[in-house]
Amino acid sequence: MQSTKKAIEITESSLAAATTGYDAVDDLLHYHERGNGIQINGKDSFSNEQAGLFITRENQTWNGYKVFGQPVKLTFSFPDYKFSSTNVAGDTGLSKFSAEQQQQAKLSLQSWADVANITFTEVAAGQKANITFGNYSQDRPGHYDYGTQAYAFLPNTIWQGQDLGGQTWYNVNQSNVKHPATEDYGRQTFTHEIGHALGLSHPGDYNAGEGNPTYNDVTYAEDTRQFSLMSYWSETNTGGDNGGHYAAAPLLDDIAAIQHLYGANPSTRTGDTVYGFNSNTGRDFLSTTSNSQKVIFAAWDAGGNDTFDFSGYTANQRINLNEKSFSDVGGLKGNVSIAAGVTIENAIGGSGNDVIVGNAANNVLKGGAGNDVLFGGGGADELWGGAGKDIFVFSAASDSAPGASDWIRDFQKGIDKIDLSFFNKEANSSDFIHFVDHFSGTAGEALLSYNASSNVTDLSVNIGGHQAPDFLVKIVGQVDVATDFIV
């Protein structure tokens, strides 16, 4: 999604990534840019923070009205409804959650507790609980309901003197509700309704069964299932593509919302965590074992040296390690994001032609097979292109400063390229970067120095016109000035 400070329309052409060098990196860095006065599809664009606040606009929490950022301990149960024939909404045919449903509901609860400072404890069916789960099958006695999906009540919902807060109800006539382990829309339904029970609203003022709302009725552009599983609207409205799959856990704006209500969970995944292939997360939605098994998630991670491993995918991918960014992973679009405040240090691409963008940390980026584009950004990064014709992009002296220089670990002379074109673009000159035999203090001078004994080439550049170079990249292998640079 190309972003400007004017109204834009989501089209296929505006979503097409550039294919080489700096343009590919710049396109990914601005992918799904939002807020700051932008309009998308004729709607105001909300930042991640704005969206989180809007989703919590009812200001209801289990700690009290407008009591924000405080941890909470909640109970939940699966009542058997042996002595109840009708629920508060008038639905009948009530029944207890099956073992399969209970397992999936617990996984949904766990996904909320992972990102927010919430503790859930199960209590027996007959005990009072903050959050309850139940099935219904008829909207009135003898009339089976095949039209609705589920509903829930926010904390502190009082109706006719009854506190309905935390009740969640599911239409067992829907096969995805009855068998949520095999149909991922059912799992999303559970997580969505628990979101309501915790205090989250839809991103817009709409409800199922109230008129015929569409995406045209949204309050802000990012009200889609790319940004929030509390939304009703397809991710395709904002240029995403989940390939017919649904998220199982809170997405980017849901995390902002729930952390506003209860604070962030500071103990989730504090070690060295791997997401995707070879995952050690213990979460099904953060893990994959085959090219056909897709992932849709927003990463919340509280520490450690972490890795996005998408090495088993064959499609071209675009992976961005910056917080609040989106990546195109495994043949989908905008299906992986990173929550605010999270640092993912490393990324491993697959066998397609991947674009991988690092952040300010010391990143290890591995392109794998295919013709890849790698950009470390700030920090002292290690870049591995892998097999194929790879491009290593740099855009600032701070990307690889002396004393904290990047390493290109597997440069292939005459095959790979180093892209310094942004320096020329910034200087508004086609020959700002020019190679010399020695430095004279002139800005733009570049020098290659090869050490045969170590097989390491130093690429030094004087960007600022100082007496000494202010940019240094260490390269394993030889580099040819005539063939191996884009300037």
From Swiss-Prot:
GO biological process, one term: symbiont-mediated killing of host cell
Record's keyword terms, sorted: Calcium, Hydrolase, Metal-binding, Metalloprotease, Protease, Repeat, Secreted, Toxin, Virulence, Zinc, Zymogen
Binding-site positions, Ca(2+) 6: 377, 379, 381, 399, 406
Reaction catalysis annotation: Preferential cleavage of bonds with hydrophobic residues in P1'
Residue numbers binding Ca(2+) 2: 304, 306, 343, 345
EC number: 3.4.24.40
Any one annotated GO CC term: extracellular region
Catalytic residues (UniProt): 193
UniProt-annotated binding residues for Ca(2+) 5: 368, 370, 372, 385, 387, 390
Name the UniProt record assigns to this protein: Serralysin
